[in-house]
């Protein structure tokens, strides 16, 4: 199937690796970032700005959404100010929900097939010390993905929730176990394989973690 893909968080380490691996001769790929020189420039920390994506998704006939944008925090939640908390939830949870809504609405109204891939975290299934707000936002994404995936039986839109272990990225570069983390290129291969898979089985959620 040919997809018109919107990849959020294209400026990040994993986003760049996903971009490299998607077959541009087969799919139309549109990149999002909060900075210029990308197809869709939106600051997801601002919920008003997120609304700008509605027309973009409709005009480009987006039928594959990769919710990859995310922000990490391991601050104790009492040390985070209110704006930081809002920002984490807006980027990690609210933006994927609203973007999925726009795509879902456009595709279901036209009875078209589609795919939503939520790049989640193991922190969205297992609570971690000093990751209260980050983990809570990812738990929210897990719940949203689970609820939305129930509709797969009634719609033509697949929803896949990817719970990833820690990767070597800029966000994790200061962590003590950085050297033992997974390589983003390997994770990107998993995600691109999901796009290219044409099987009839429904994969609603899975985990990827380091075996070491």
Where are the regions that the model predicts?
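C-terminal helical subdomain
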Residues: 161, 176-212
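Substrate-binding pocket helix/loop in short-chain dehydrogenase/reductase
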Residues: 76-77, 84-86
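Rossmann-fold cofactor-recognition segment
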Residues: 34-48
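Residue(s) in the substrate-gating loop at a strand-loop-helix junction
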Residues: 121
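Conserved NAD(P)H cofactor-binding loop of Rossmann-fold oxidoreductase domains
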Residues: 68-74
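Active-site helix of classical SDR
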Residues: 100, 137-138
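N-terminal Rossmann NAD(P)H-binding glycine-rich loop of SDR-like oxidoreductase domains
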Residues: 11, 15-19
């Amino acid at each position: 199937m040919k997809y018109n893909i919107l990849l959020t968080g294209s400026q990040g380490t994993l986003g760049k690796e996903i971009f490299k691996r998607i077959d541009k001769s087969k799919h139309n790929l549109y990149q999002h970032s909060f900075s210029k020189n990308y197809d869709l420039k939106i600051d997801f920390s601002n919920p008003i700005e997120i609304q700008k994506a509605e027309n973009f998704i409709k005009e480009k006939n987006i039928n594959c959404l990769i919710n990859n944008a995310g922000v990490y925090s391991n601050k104790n939640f009492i040390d985070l100010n209110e704006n930081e908390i809002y920002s984490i939830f807006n980027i990690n949870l609210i933006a994927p929900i609203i973007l999925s809504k726009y795509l879902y609405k456009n595709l279901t109204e036209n009875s078209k097939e589609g795919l939503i891939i939520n790049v989640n975290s193991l922190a969205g299934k297992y609570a971690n010390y000093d990751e209260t707000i980050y983990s809570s936002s990812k738990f929210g994404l897990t719940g949203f993905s689970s609820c939305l995936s129930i509709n797969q039986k009634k719609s033509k839109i697949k929803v896949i929730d990817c719970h990833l272990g820690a990767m070597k990225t800029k966000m994790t570069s200061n962590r003590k176990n950085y050297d033992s983390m997974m390589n983003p290129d390997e994770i990107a291969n998993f995600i691109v394989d999901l796009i290219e898979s044409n099987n009839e089985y429904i994969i609603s959620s899975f985990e990827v973690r380091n075996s070491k």
